[in-house]
Amino acid sequence: MKTLTILRHAKSGWDVQVERDFDRPINKRGARGADLIGQWLKRQKLPVDRIIASPAVRVTETLDIFQPAADLDTIEPHWDRRIYLASAATLIDVIRDTGRDAGHLLISGHNPGLEDLILMLVPESDDDELRGEVEEKLPTSALARLEIDIDDWHDLDVNMARFAAFIRPRDLDPTLAPAMDHD
């Protein structure tokens, strides 16, 4: 069995003027969310043995905060440009390229691709509350952990996963609940 942890980048600063969307940094609220989610992962003692991530600034800054908080700072992320603004289908290809040796993979990137990836991997069910929450919104710094009954990431396909966990920054600190979280 494999586990896939999906981490959306932290809240970014729309007020910062940058030439390219790729260069947009996270803001203070985003930094707090990334730290809280990292601490939560550490408390849960959920292992991660490989990280693949978008090289966009808001993802690298998220991981700069999340990894030490989660006690994962010894893992060097593999930066993959295909993850930047990728579709769910592209994200599945990226994950399949991981091979068999990583048992607990973490992918960090962007919406709508990550949200669509979760909804593609976890089958629809009337009684799956976590899937319903993701259908509503995968907010910034949210983390979903999926369990998948495969031995090799190359075998990953749709409707194969089940939720092990889903956590948002506002679940850990209600002051981080947004009126409208558009990024």
Feature locations, PLM:
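Short, glycine/serine-rich, charged loops/turns that create anion-binding
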Residues: 11, 56, 112, 150, ...
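Residue-level preference for the first positions of well-ordered beta-strands
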Residues: 4, 104-106, 143
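Active-site-proximal alpha-helix that buttresses catalytic centers in soluble enzyme cores
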Residues: 2-82, 123-127, 179-183
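A short, structured active-site edge motif that brings together acidic residues
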Residues: 55, 74-90, 134-140
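Domain-level recognition of soluble alpha/beta enzyme cores
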Residues: 122-164, 169
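Glycine-rich phosphate/pyrophosphate-binding loop and the adjoining helix
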Residues: 169-183
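Glycine-rich phosphate-binding loop signature in dinucleotide/nucleotide-binding domains
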Residues: 44-46, 98-103
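A glycine-rich beta-strand to alpha-helix segment
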Residues: 103-124
